[in-house]
């Protein structure tokens, strides 16, 4: 019954169509490729040249390097997860309503903490900047597509029945209620 209420709601149908169109668009394809490419690039750097770069740093800067690399990895994994969910919508492996679930939403990121970029490896700082930019774009898509998920239309018949029930419980239909008070 609940599915019938959702499917009859034009606003909800329009929302589902908009999400499906985005998931099937060239824009999404480019975003997906960019996101997955950045994930691969970050993994390659952090598992290879990044290890060498971090060993060249003093202890304090090595900790900053580790923190920044964890943030890059976290941002990219969250963005990649969101992109994979959208691809599942496109491939019809997941319903739009399921993709709209809160567990798939992205959180707004806080302000970045200050880092002396002049002493950190340029490749790491490039990954930091690009992962932030990608996450911000994906977050905006997430917010635009899912933040105002239409609710099922109000059922006016049920609303009227509820009003009648409340009135009856309050004695509105009892002709003798005037003398009982």
Q: What is each residue range found by the language model?
A:
Residues 2-181:
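Surface-exposed peri-terminal alpha-helical interaction modules
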């Amino acid at each position: 019954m609940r599915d019938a209420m959702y499917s009859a709601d034009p606003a909800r149908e329009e929302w589902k169509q908009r999400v499906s169109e985005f998931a099937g668009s060239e824009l999404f394809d480019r975003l997906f490729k960019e996101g997955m490419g950045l994930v691969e690039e970050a993994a390659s750097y952090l598992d290879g040249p990044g290890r060498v770069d971090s060993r060249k740093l003093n202890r304090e800067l090595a900790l900053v390097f580790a923190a920044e690399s964890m943030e890059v990895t976290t941002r990219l994994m969250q963005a990649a997860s969101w992109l994979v969910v959208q691809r599942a919508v496109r491939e019809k492996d997941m319903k739009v309503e399921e993709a709209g679930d809160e567990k798939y939403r992205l959180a707004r990121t806080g302000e970045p903490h200050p880092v002396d970029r002049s002493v950190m490896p340029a490749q790491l700082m490039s990954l930091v900047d690009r992962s932030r930019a990608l996450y911000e774009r994906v977050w905006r898509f997430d917010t635009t597509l899912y933040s105002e998920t239409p609710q099922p239309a109000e059922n006016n018949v049920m609303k009227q029945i509820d009003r009648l029930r409340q009135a009856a419980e309050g004695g509105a239909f009892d002709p003798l209620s005037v003398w009982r008070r």
